[in-house]
């Protein structure tokens, strides 16, 4: 029924230089009396931790404050004006081929990843008229970089001559945590200025990438941008094309994983926020919800930055003074908007399923959901309409939200002029501000997987892992690492993990990168 996990892990990618992270050794699983562990947070990180612990025979309780699992990729039903019940979510997410550990989690319930659909291109448009694409760019570095430069309209011969090679070659050998030691002190924008990237390439390709962190590139750490270059472009041969779930997140991902957890005897408690943690003098921890206090042997904190700050503040005995102070300084990225629009007519047949944009006011990307999501496609076929989604990241906290929504729609009309004549049958607007912020100089404040208390581990996409991972893959990887740390204490085998190469891909590239030092 389910894929069986051996703990050894499989890369399942094309990159022969992908790096293995060995699992802690030990016996196969608990037999007899096993420890009780609470995992707090039912997003990707929490599900990964709960999955591995349960597979090893640990007694796991998973706490999630929302009605369903998935965290920031959750979904919920909503009824349209035509009476149709559809699934709303926080929008498009790209499942890149480099996400080895996230894909390994999904393979527990979908061994062939048939729930994911490949998108054929990753196009980028700028309001000035410039357009770029990654469909024809070679996947293997350094051919990928050379191909992008050769094919992109944003790079000319004059631009190449202006580039500062001493600053640029450091991107050829990105290592964690060294990249943070070198670049965490400057912004992504200042770093690109130092390299003297062409202005057009700066705004089109690299600003689009940096805003995927839900942050203004003027505030984003250059180390995160350099790591992103390495993961998606210069360090991996998996390429920049990606997959998307073929159905809404709950049906494609979380409902099967919820069932998998229950089969492995995980007590999944949704609609149950955790209020306080109190370490016990003799070992273990007391966890308090709205209606009870329960003792556990260990704890995985798999919360977003804001929820982690609040829980630690409400738990004065948790951790030590330095750890608590660093947690208190964690920042949350600015608000972002997801607008989903149900239109009375289709967009042009040649519009891509996903489009990254720059220079269109607040609009950062456009998705035509009925190109790839089954539920949206069925609605579009029945109504002869279309389902379009707009994202606007890093919105000023004091912005007029209605005005931002209206302006994003106006920019859609610029991007896809045929939508001007479309009638808006229904719309949903989701405003959220719960993604982690990776500000200049902020790396030292981010928690690691291990806390001062060996019975408490931390997971999430803001966690320092010492590995070249980001976004959803950082969440999944940190969840497995958090479980590994606990299993290692108990002498039980952990999960083997994979990452993109952990340094430059060849000795030549590494020697070139050394010139930047």
UniProtKB/Swiss-Prot annotation:
GO terms for molecular function: oxidoreductase activity. It holds the Pfam family Amino_oxidase. Residues 1-24 are annotated as: Disordered. The keyword Protease does not apply. FAD binds at residues 45, 64-65, 72, 99, 461, 472. Its EC number is 1.3.99.39. It comes from the Bacteria. Its cofactor is FAD. Keywords: Carotenoid biosynthesis, FAD, Flavoprotein, Oxidoreductase. Disruption phenotype: Deletion of the gene leads to accumulation of beta-carotene. GO terms for biological process: carotenoid biosynthetic process. Gene3D superfamilies: FAD/NAD(P)-binding domain. It catalyses: a carotenoid beta-end derivative + 2 A = a carotenoid phi-end derivative + 2 AH2. Pathway: Carotenoid biosynthesis. SUPFAM superfamilies: FAD/NAD(P)-binding domain (SSF51905). PANTHER family: AMINE OXIDASE, PROTOPORPHYRINOGEN OXIDASE. Belongs to the carotenoid/retinoid oxidoreductase family. Involved in the biosynthesis of isorenieratene, a carotenoid with aromatic end groups. Catalyzes the introduction of two additional double bonds into each ionone ring of beta-carotene to produce isorenieratene. The reaction includes an intramolecular methyl transfer from position C1 to position C2 of the ring. This is Carotenoid phi-ring synthase. It comes from Streptomyces griseus.
